[in-house]
């Protein structure tokens, strides 16, 4: 039984559906749904591959946002409760 783990879309106004924050938001929702699916179906390797692709896309967007605007990046990380990027 899959529970709806999606994050409330009220965080993002309708005008900003293409912004980096909204893209990270929607990718995070997909990550949560795929993670729940993989807990039930552990051998679904195509879904595992899809999860890795989504995670890499989200990471690219977060790297871009952290370089462009650190305050927006920090705010987004706090709202979505995801880990910060590893820095060298």
From Swiss-Prot:
The keyword Protease does not apply. It comes from the Eukaryota. One of its GO terms (molecular function) is structural constituent of ribosome. Part of the 30S ribosomal subunit. The lineage of its organism: Eukaryota, Viridiplantae, Streptophyta, Embryophyta, Tracheophyta. Signal peptide: none annotated. Pfam families: Ribosomal_S15. Belongs to the universal ribosomal protein uS15 family. This is Small ribosomal subunit protein uS15c. PROSITE patterns: RIBOSOMAL_S15 (PS00362). GO terms for cellular component: chloroplast; ribonucleoprotein complex; ribosome. GO terms for biological process: translation. PANTHER family: RIBOSOMAL PROTEIN S15, BACTERIAL AND ORGANELLAR, SMALL RIBOSOMAL SUBUNIT PROTEIN US15M.
